[in-house]
Structures are given as structure tokens and as C-alpha cells.
Regions:
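Class I Rossmann-like S-adenosyl-L-methionine
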Residues: 2-240, 339
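Rossmann-like S-adenosyl-L-methionine
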Residues: 3-11, 21, 28-29, 207-476
Length: 476
């Protein structure tokens, strides 16, 4: 376990092993309490100390098993280790996400390190790469000095192409086959994602929210595309701010905000968010409906729907009905056939469009899992389409950048359902004041396809379908 913090000596020579025990804690907590009582500010931690390297190695040992989402595993670890201050937690989280974004490089550089040593070596190398070799203290490096020097001396330009791209081989092949600017995509997902927020138009205007954020010392700029969106210049905690607690803003990526606008719901309509999850798009749709009509939020995960409750309370929406269903074939859905004016199918997907903010996902995904998801997508779309009335609009959306989850699914559906027609997505958004360049319109075609390397959003796909009710006559 991690050793107590100690004053750092820079990495020059490393006599002795770095201690790796849980800190005793009593004297340390007493000193912290005395410092707080004196009003003394706690100095920023030196990253490469035995204390933080020990914790970082422990976290990486847990996270790199890839048994679950990194953010969930980090939260569990922090709850178990109360000796970590807020700055420590922030530093550890940043470094863990850095390691996950550069896991292929780390694995290549450390090979053939013994598995038992891998988390500790990965912790040391990640700190050296992210913060500079000088951040490693001698005590933290200890007897690993020779191994670390050898790893840091490896010529990374000799890595295989997929390792340079920081993705598995199979995903590298798919992305490079589909996109001419695949290298731009790989560079984009190597960086962190910005913090985007949507202004709740039921409670504030964009300018009012900007002023309130500015008064709280939070700098924001208006988004390039979303009329309701702001992008924060720096990532900050919003949870304590009244503008967030009172529901005037919600965290939501710009691309996700535009998905709701593609649905373009109107007041007093009957609308369905078929795979609502925690409700980010549900909230945006409800605000566009001005909390009128009926907005059904379906999901197979009752716990996720329950997580929507505090968000709904903050938002001021009272037109949302949350319904947990068994699956897309739930018998209760049959009673709602052809009842809805608008249906959003935010389909389960690989999440490859979110790799900037979920870097572990690329290592937890497999071709077999992708095939399973693909079958579910087609089934969900067919079931959701039955809910739409004639003349209604259906939006099929994913946060994937892979054609087989997007265009291929929709084209197969249209071939089976000639009563549906594809609408031009850019035109739908332009009618609402969202401007795209001519190059972007060419990029989209009839689809909506935002990409991190082109629009600086998460990767999102959507298709806008309308139900005409008129089946074409067979050709004679």
C-alpha cells in the first residue's frame, strides 16, 4: 500500500526500494488539522512522491483489469482511501486517464515487464511522460531506476501503427478504412474532452447563464453550433454553484445537444425517448417542449432512470414519465403503437465517439461485443419505429463513429420499411438557426455525423426519418 508523503528528491539515482505501505495517518491528519486551523493553504502535491506513486500503482492495478468503467472504479478507490485530499484525487484521476489514453504506448515501452511489476512501472512512466522526468523523486523510483531509465529511452517512433494510435489493432483497421483523416481522429482521442453545458431555456437565457458563471469566476464561451450551449474554458466543479444546483445549466456535450434539436419536438406533442438512460437528451427535449405535452422516458435500466430524478427536479420539468421496460419487446409498448409524434432512438452502441472522455472503453470493447451490440441496434430501431404515428419523426442516434452501427443499420431498416423516408439532417438543424459550412454539409450528406477531429465534439451520428404512411407501388 502507499507510503506516507515525504519531501521529494528529484530522480537522479535511486538507492533503495520505495516504501509501499498504508500511511499510519494519525500524525498526518493531526498536522493537516492544525494547518487548517491556522488557515494555512495546503501546498500542491509533488506528483512523483512515494505516496502518490503508490496510490497510482494501486489504482492502475485495479483499473487496468478493465472489469468496469474507470470513473466508477476511481470513485470506489477514493471512497476507500480517506487519506487522499481533493488535490491528490484530482492528480490521480488526471494521471490515470492519461495512462489509459496512452496504454498502448505504455504496454509497448514496458514490454517484457513482469505482470506483477507492471502497475508500478506504468505509474512511474505515466508520471514521467505527463509531468516530466524531473517530477519523479528518488524515493519513489527506488530500485526501479534502471528499469525506468531503459523504458524512457525506448524509441517510441518504432511502435506499430495501432500502438501509436493508442487503439487495439482491430479498431485501428476499422477507423483507418472508414476515414481519410483517421490520424486526426487518433490525435483527438489522445486528448481530454472539453466541459460543455446546456442552458435550460425554461429557467435562463444563454447570456444570463454566462453572466452568472462569470460572477462565480467560471469563464465560458458560446458554442459554435448549439444555440443553447456554452463551453467552459477550464474544467471546474459545478456542483456547488447555484446556477447548476437550481437547474439553469446541465452538463451535456454539444453534439448531444444537437441530437435533441434534430427531433425538433413541439409543444403539447407526445414524444418518446426510447433509450433514455440518465436523461441528458430527455431534459433537452423537455425544455424544447416547454414542459408541455407528454414525454415518455423508456429504458431497461431502472437504476439509470432513477438517477434522472434529481436532474428532473432541478430542471423544472413536469411532463416526463419514466418507465422501466424489460426490453424492446416489452408487451406494454404494444399499447402505445402509432401513438407518438416524435421518437428518439438513442441506441446502445460501442461508444467509440466518446473515447476522449472514456479512454478505457477502447480496451474493454471487442469485435464480438460490437457484433452483439449491432444486433441489438437493429432490433431496438424496429421496435421503436412501431410507436411512431403517420407523419411523425424518428431520430436514430448513436455516440459511435463506426459505419456498421450507423449508416448500415439505418439503410437496412429503410430497405425493410419503405414507409419511412430519410430527411437531410443539416437542413433540419439549419431551420433552427444552426449553421454549417459547405464542407461540413458534404461531410454529412443526409446524415448527421459530428467528429472530434472536425467539429471538436464527441463523435455522434444521427439519421432523421419521417413516416409517410405511403408504401411505393411495385414496379410493373
Amino acid at each position: 500500500m502507499p507510503a506516507p508523503k515525504q519531501k521529494a528528491r528529484r530522480f537522479r539515482a535511486g538507492p533503495g526500494a520505495a516504501p509501499h505501505r498504508r500511511p499510519e495517518g494519525g500524525a498526518r491528519r493531526q498536522a493537516q488539522a492544525q494547518a487548517r486551523a491556522r488557515g494555512a493553504a495546503r501546498p500542491a502535491p509533488v506528483v512523483g512522491t512515494p505516496f502518490l506513486i503508490g496510490h497510482l500503482a494501486d489504482v492502475l492495478h485495479m483499473v487496468l483489469k478493465l472489469d468496469g468503467p474507470a470513473d466508477v472504479l476511481l470513485s470506489v478507490y477514493f471512497k476507500r482511501n480517506h487519506e487522499l485530499g481533493s488535490r491528490d484525487r484530482g492528480t490521480l484521476a488526471e494521471t490515470v486517464y492519461f495512462a489509459l489514453r496512452h496504454l498502448a504506448s505504455l504496454s509497448w515501452a514496458m514490454a517484457p515487464a513482469a505482470p506483477a511489476r507492471a502497475p508500478r512501472l506504468a505509474a512511474l512512466v505515466a508520471v514521467a511522460w505527463k509531468y516530466g522526468r524531473g517530477e519523479l523523486s528518488e524515493a519513489a523510483v527506488g530500485r526501479d531506476k534502471e528499469a525506468i531509465e531503459a523504458i524512457l529511452a525506448k524509441p517510441l517512433e518504432r511502435m506499430p501503427a495501432a500502438a501509436k494510435a493508442e487503439v487495439p489493432d482491430w479498431l485501428y483497421e476499422k477507423i483507418t478504412a472508414q476515414y481519410e483523416d483517421a490520424e486526426g481522429f487518433f490525435r483527438a482521442i489522445a486528448e481530454g474532452a472539453p466541459l460543455d453545458i446546456r442552458v435550460n431555456s425554461l429557467k435562463a437565457t444563454v447570456s444570463e447563464a454566462m453572466k452568472e458563471l462569470d460572477a462565480a469566476g467560471v469563464a465560458a464561451v458560446q458554442m459554435r453550433y448549439s444555440p443553447d450551449g456554452l463551453r467552459l474554458k477550464e474544467k471546474v466543479g459545478l456542483g456547488a454553484l447555484p446556477v447548476y444546483r437550481e437547474g439553469r445549466i446541465e452538463i451535456q456535450d454539444e453534439g448531444s445537444q444537437l441530437i435533441a434539436r434534430l427531433l425538433a419536438p413541439k409543444r403539447r406533442e407526445m414524444v418518446c425517448d426510447f433509450c433514455a438512460g440518465a436523461g441528458g437528451k430527455t431534459l433537452a427535449i423537455g425544455a424544447m417542449m416547454r414542459s408541455t405535452g407528454s414525454l415518455y422516458a423508456f429504458d431497461i435500466n431502472a437504476k439509470r432512470l432513477e438517477g434522472m430524478v434529481p436532474r428532473l427536479r432541478r430542471s423544472g420539468l413536469d411532463n416526463v414519465r419514466r418507465i422501466a421496460i424489460r426490453d424492446e419487446h416489452d408487451k406494454r409498448l404494444g399499447r402505445l403503437a402509432a401513438k407518438f409524434d416524435r421518437v428518439l432512438v438513442d441506441a446502445p452502441c460501442s461508444g467509440t465517439g466518446t473515447l476522449r472522455r472514456n479512454p478505457d472503453l477502447r480496451w474493454r470493447l471487442s469485435p464480438e461485443e460490437l457484433s452483439r451490440i449491432n444486433a441489438v441496434q437493429a432490433s431496438v430501431l424496429r421496435s421503436a419505429a412501431k410507436l411512431l404515428k403517420e407523419g411523425g419523426r424518428l431520430v436514430y442516434a448513436t455516440c459511435s463513429v463506426l459505419k456498421e452501427e450507423n449508416q448500415d443499420v439505418v439503410e437496412a431498416f429503410l430497405a425493410e420499411h419503405p414507409e419511412f423516408v430519410l430527411k437531410n439532417a443539416a437542413s433540419v438543424l439549419e431551420a433552427q438557426g444552426v449553421a454549417f459550412s459547405e464542407a461540413e454539409k458534404v461531410q454529412f450528406g443526409d446524415w448527421f455525423a459530428m467528429l472530434p477531429q472536425r467539429q471538436d465534439t464527441d463523435g455522434f451520428f444521427a439519421a432523421v426519418l419521417e413516416k409517410t404512411g405511403k408504401k411505393p407501388q411495385p414496379r410493373g
